[in-house]
Amino acid sequence: MLLHIPDILSADQVADFRRRLDAADWTDGRETVGHLGAQAKHNQQLPEGSPLRRELGEIILVALARHPLFFSAALPLKYLPPRFNRYSGGGTYGFHVDGAVMNLANGEQLRSDISCTLFLSAPYEYEGGELIISDTYGEHEVKLPAGDLIVYPSSSLHQVRPVTAGARVASFFWVQSMVRDDVQRRLLWEMDGSIERLRQTGGDAEAVLQLTGVYHNLLRRWSEV
């Protein structure tokens, strides 16, 4: 499921992030990938051990926990903590698929079900830099307002087009969902949204209760926790 979730961060939060990131020390993004990935990746990242990366990442995780649309769509179980990258001067990342299993700092592993990009640069601040996500329906071009999030299946082939002017700053992270199957997650998300709309419009209380029960029984059947 490809989903645009607006306003994860407020304008004030984005401005604070940018002020601090613009003054940060960045490293070559190729240091964080294997040999094949290094051939396609041309950007900068905050170092893995950066205190700033951890601090800003925690702010993002708190914001996500407060966002009902994100929870409904992702049904998150684990996160690979947010990282930060910057593309400028022709920086790009060619077509690739994210790794299936990632190592967490606590020694556990994460299955990458959902890939997330949180835009921290406004579209007018840079040229190029579109996130291109390829699936069975074709290619989708994504370039969102600062503070907005795009989520998509980690199995998707995707790339970042070259940034030919300005700088594209973003955070990116992965989620292991309670429901690994993307089709099942989408069905649950659609049902959850329908139940909420029925509640808001004064739908039949008994029918809403029954649908809510169906939702939770499907979640119980499909979830892995």
Swiss-Prot record:
Keywords: Dioxygenase, Iron, Metal-binding, Oxidoreductase, Vitamin C. Its cofactor is Fe(2+); L-ascorbate. GO terms for biological process: DNA damage response; intracellular iron ion homeostasis. Residues 78-177 form the Fe2OG dioxygenase domain. PROSITE patterns: FE2OG_OXY. It holds the Pfam family 2OG-FeII_Oxy_3. SUPFAM superfamilies: Clavaminate synthase-like. It comes from the Bacteria. 2-oxoglutarate binds at R168. Binds 1 Fe(2+) ion per subunit. It is an enzyme of class 1 (oxidoreductase). One of its GO terms (molecular function) is iron ion binding. Its EC number is 1.14.11.-. Disulfide bonds: none annotated. InterPro entries: Oxoglu/Fe-dep_dioxygenase_dom, PKHD_C, PKHD_hydroxylase, Pro_4_hyd_alph, Pro_4_hyd_alph_FE2OG_OXY. Fe cation binds at H96, D98, H158. This is PKHD-type hydroxylase Smlt1146. The lineage of its organism: Bacteria, Pseudomonadati, Pseudomonadota, Gammaproteobacteria, Lysobacterales.
